[in-house]
């Protein structure tokens, strides 16, 4: 029987081997805060506080250091426990605009305090560059980065736990 999911990132493994970094709106003068840490539940916790001051309003983390060809798959499945807010699954490929990476994002809504597996089809991934929408197609054959962004224009604390990120058919 053919596998219907393929684990890309398993946060229950202590040896993740991925480069992870947080990028907040401070890159453009904002005051939002975000951080990532491993939990005792064997998950990654992405938490912080969104501030709308100084034209801010986002926090994100990015995972790089690996490349994925997911052309035989339909989308990404994430196993998360959230706070009821809407986040974005974000991917980068070789696609460029003005010499920097284009981001492809699809929004997903979390269920407060419940673990859920959410499936995001590649067809839902929309291109943008520094918040500006672009007319570009997402190519799942050349993914070089994955991550999560919170940019729901709501000030306040946030928390999202992630157990795994997989491809699904």
Locate each region found by the language model.
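Beta-rich carbohydrate-recognition modules and glycan-binding surfaces
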Residues: 1-169
């Amino acid at each position: 029987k053919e596998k219907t999911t393929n684990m890309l990132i398993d946060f229950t493994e202590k040896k993740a081997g991925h480069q992870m970094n947080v990028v907040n709106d401070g890159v453009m003068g904002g005051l939002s805060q975000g951080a990532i840490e491993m939990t005792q539940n064997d998950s990654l916790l992405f938490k912080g506080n969104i501030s709308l001051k100084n034209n801010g309003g986002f926090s994100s983390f990015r995972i790089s250091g690996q490349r994925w060809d997911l052309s035989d798959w339909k989308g990404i499945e994430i196993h998360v426990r959230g706070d009821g807010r809407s986040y974005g699954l974000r991917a980068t490929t070789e696609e460029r605009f003005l010499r920097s990476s284009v981001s492809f994002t699809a929004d997903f809504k979390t269920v407060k305090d419940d673990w859920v597996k959410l499936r995001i089809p590649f067809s839902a991934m929309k291109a943008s560059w520094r918040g500006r929408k672009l007319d570009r197609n997402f190519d799942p054959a050349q993914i070089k980065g994955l991550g999560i962004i919170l940019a729901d224009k709501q000030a306040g604390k946030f928390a999202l736990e992630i157990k795994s990120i997989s491809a699904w058919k």
